[in-house]
Amino acid sequence: MSKQPSLSYKDAGVDIDAGEALVERIKGVAKRTARPEVMGGLGGFGALCEIPAGYKQPVLVSGTDGVGTKLRLALNLNKHDSIGQDLVAMCVNDLVVCGAEPLFFLDYYATGKLNVDVAATVVTGIGAGCELAGCSLVGGETAEMPGMYEGEDYDLAGFCVGVVEKAEIIDGSKVATGDALIALPSSGPHSNGYSLIRKILEVSATDIENTQLDGKPLTDLLMAPTRIYVKPLLQLIKQTGAVKAMAHITGGGLLDNIPRVLPKNAQAVVDVASWQRPAVFDFLQEKGNVDEHEMHRVLNCGVGMVICVAQDQVEAALNVLRAEGEQPWVIGRIEQAAEGAAQVELQNLKAH
């Protein structure tokens, strides 16, 4: 017999029992998100989902995303309850812009050492996000990988599939000169620009946990969960049929995201004076001495979603959105793009 001690997976840093305990903890979370099309529960090799009834030519739409370095801030602050909603929002908001109804969601959670309480908190947030989006959490992967991550640090990724009627896909092809642009507010920086945000906090030596803006803790403002716009937007599409294009304002801000849904000959003219920028963005700009153009290229500056409708549909669209609890406003218009001009023009930019 060898004198070498018998090694186990746990000796190597992987706790199978912890993984199984997590699955038991989150089964109820997944159950709360269940849609009738989903077949079976957690634990199988693959998740099964039928196409919802009523579609003539259903088209599946998929998306995957993470939450960037907002996760580092969450780890530093030991605040894990809302990062799951961020993850869902980043995926489902990308699907709804083409008119798709999210069907199901899967997550990937990778860590050096699995902390069951933290992971369960994160997944509970994912479940809450799925409920807000009306999609089902059908499974995921929890990977304990010693030597790949520092201690209990973790990384997150999400994957979502939705469905849209082929004839009702929103792709921006009908956008025309004279159309109006409607904005929906963000809750804060959402899940983008956090490498810049963290650099600003570092360089300015901001005591993040003891700073308040307008009576609110800076930590709450920076960690506010990304808004999920799915249900109000699906209602807008259903009730008006007026939506020509939508842009989810993520990394790249207004300047890089609006052009993704515009025809080449269209220019979005955005009036920056049409909304009051939330204080957290002014704070970051001042502390980091950030150029105004850079602000709009990196951060959403208070705008989470932009919707394009014909001018004669503006009031109807605003009314539906307000009835859904949104606070929309007209942020700009579509004009013919001049030769070589940028596809987004920001008007009334303040001098910095």
Curated annotation (Swiss-Prot):
Pathway entry: Purine metabolism; IMP biosynthesis via de novo pathway; 5-amino-1-(5-phospho-D-ribosyl)imidazole from N(2)-formyl-N(1)-(5-phospho-D-ribosyl)glycinamide: step 2/2
Pfam families on file: AIRS (PF00586), AIRS_C (PF02769)
Keyword set, alphabetical order: ATP-binding, Cytoplasm, Ligase, Nucleotide-binding, Purine biosynthesis
Keyword Transferase carried by entry: no
GO CC annotation, single: cytosol
E.C. number(s) listed in UniProt: 6.3.3.1
CDD domains per the UniProt record, alphabetical: PurM
GO MF annotation terms: ATP binding; phosphoribosylamine-glycine ligase activity; phosphoribosylformylglycinamidine cyclo-ligase activity
Enzyme class: ligase
Disulphide linkage map: none
HAMAP family attached to this UniProt entry: AIRS
Family the entry assigns: Belongs to the AIR synthase family.
Record-given protein name: Phosphoribosylformylglycinamidine cyclo-ligase
